[in-house]
């Protein structure tokens, strides 16, 4: 709500109908009833869509643990170094709980695939938990990574016995093979996961964070990064490449309060992701796609989609000059109106229009923000102008004829 006021952007306003009061606190949220879920499933079915549920296990279960503390290793929710502590998979009671949750979901979601999660599991509690250590000894498991693999294998067998196929994030590969599972590769810092999964015969869905996480704000390079993503690297064999089933764009909505904001984060990135997905590898034409981008924007206008206005161009974040300089910022979207400020404030619809280059004679910070012809706002840019005198020339002493060269042979990131 504060961001909506700070940035003059109603996309960040929580809808009033979604707010409710608990005591003195105004909260947002809610839950789905069984009836709600059945309505969603039926609505999606008419449109050829399967709504695949993900109940993340054994990590990301803090809400369940808060409600049922016995699910945790030490009877309470806690945090590890980066993530909340997981379920205690050493207790049979915990395993029965997990199975009962999925039994109910199988009833509501009549699909072949279910998503078990399996990511971001902090295993530090398992190292100290008597129940988990007993489980490891009983199953002959060498370490806590193998304990997670044991849990995932058990849940996979549970799903398969009920005619379902398990999906998990690429962490499910840690601690042992999971043949038959579908792996969603999301960690680009673990590139070997794709090769490992496909060698095991697993199907793989590509959704690497740096490219396909649409909850990360788009910038001037986002579209090009997706365009240049190597879908099927040469390091994979032909058989492994056939295990790559497709791509997925992820939009996590913790900070997406409205559907309008969701559209803004999805488009136009979703367009290039779709085109990458259906184009034969090696034949995607970035220039051709970019040449069609404005046509796509017009189509989105006709559909009433709140897409992100293409990034402003022709500027540098810092511009140094000696006497004066003229701005040269350009908006690729025809009909857009640019508004600017020079006092450090956020541009609003009431700020001066940027209709022609500005003459800059002194230090200043320029903010420019695009507005669609219908009034929708885009992301603003910041350009810092610094007036400087010419640097004094060096006065070399004790020089010798020739050049001195240092050669560094290494790979720089």
Residue ranges of model-derived segments:
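Domain-scale activation on soluble regions of proteins
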Residues: 41, 45-50, 57, 62-64, ...
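Short, compositionally stereotyped local motifs that mark structural "simplifiers"
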Residues: 280, 284-404
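Substrate-binding cleft of carbohydrate-active enzyme catalytic domains
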Residues: 1-164
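Aromatic-lined ligand-binding clefts that engage carbohydrates, nucleic acids, or primary amines
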Residues: 329-331, 408, 413
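Short, solvent-exposed loop/turn elements at domain surfaces
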Residues: 255-257, 348-349, 412
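Residues within well-ordered beta-strands of beta-sheet-rich folds
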Residues: 50, 54, 367-369, 413
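Substrate-binding groove of N-acetylhexosamine-processing glycoside hydrolases
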Residues: 39, 92-113, 120, 134-338
């Amino acid at each position: 709500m504060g961001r909506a006021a700070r940035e003059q952007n109603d996309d960040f306003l929580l809808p009033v109908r979604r707010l409710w009061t608990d005591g003195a606190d105004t909260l947002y949220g809610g839950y789905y009833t069984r009836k709600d879920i059945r309505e969603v499933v039926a609505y999606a079915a008419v449109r050829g869509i399967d709504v695949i549920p993900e109940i993340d296990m054994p990590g990301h279960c803090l809400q369940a643990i808060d409600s049922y503390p016995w699910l945790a290793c030490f009877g309470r929710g806690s945090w590890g170094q980066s993530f909340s502590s997981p379920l205690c998979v050493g207790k049979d009671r915990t395993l029965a709980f997990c199975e009962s949750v999925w039994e109910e979901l199988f009833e509501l979601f009549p699909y072949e695939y279910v998503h078990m999660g399996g990511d971001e599991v902090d295993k530090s509690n398992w190292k100290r938990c008597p129940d988990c250590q007993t489980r490891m000894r009983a199953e002959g498991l060498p370490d806590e990574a193998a304990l997670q693999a044991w849990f995932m294998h058990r849940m996979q067998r549970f799903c398969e016995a009920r005619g379902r196929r398990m999906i998990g994030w690429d962490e499910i590969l840690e601690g042992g093979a999971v043949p038959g599972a579908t792996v969603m590769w999301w960690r680009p810092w673990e590139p070997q996961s794709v090769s490992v999964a496909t060698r095991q015969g697993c199907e793989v869905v590509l959704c690497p964070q740096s490219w396909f996480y649409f909850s990360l704000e788009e910038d001037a390079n986002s579209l090009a990064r997706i365009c240049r993503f190597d879908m099927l690297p040469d390091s994979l064999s032909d058989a492994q490449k056939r295990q790559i089933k497709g791509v997925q764009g992820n939009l996590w909505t913790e900070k997406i309060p409205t559907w309008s904001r969701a559209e803004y984060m999805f488009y136009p990135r979703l367009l290039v992701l779709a085109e990458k997905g259906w184009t034969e590898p090696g034949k995607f034409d970035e220039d051709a796609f970019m040449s069609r981008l404005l046509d796509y924007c017009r189509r989105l206008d006709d559909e009433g989609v709140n897409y992100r206005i293409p990034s402003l161009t022709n500027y540098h974040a810092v511009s140094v000059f000696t006497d004066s300089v003229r701005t040269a910022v350009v908006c690729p979207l025809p009909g857009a109106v640019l508004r600017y400020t020079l006092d450090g404030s956020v541009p609003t619809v009431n700020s001066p229009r940027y209709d022609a280059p500005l003459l800059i004679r002194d230090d200043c910070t320029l903010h420019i923000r695009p507005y669609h012809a219908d009034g929708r706002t885009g992301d603003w840019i910041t350009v810092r102008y610094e007036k400087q005198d010419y640097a004094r020339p060096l006065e070399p002493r004790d020089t010798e004829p020739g050049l001195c060269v240092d050669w560094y042979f290494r790979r720089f990131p």
